[in-house]
Amino acid sequence: MRQTFQPSRIVRKRRHGFRTRMSTRMGRKILNRRRTQGRRVLCA
């Protein structure tokens, strides 16, 4: 069994990055929800 988390900065940014979130309607909903929660970090 290998470790399931294989870190990659490129994959992290592409899947959970700000621009990816902004590109879809649901992604913008996620960002707004995190803003109202008062999160310091909105996304990767």
Swiss-Prot record:
Keywords, alphabetical: Ribonucleoprotein, Ribosomal protein
GO MF term set: structural constituent of ribosome
A Pfam family annotated for this UniProt entry: Ribosomal_L34
InterPro entries from the UniProt entry: Ribosomal_bL34 (IPR000271)
Domain of life: Bacteria
Similarity section: Belongs to the bacterial ribosomal protein bL34 family.
Protein name, entry field: Large ribosomal subunit protein bL34
Species for this entry: Ehrlichia ruminantium (strain Gardel)
Organism classification: Bacteria, Pseudomonadati, Pseudomonadota, Alphaproteobacteria, Rickettsiales
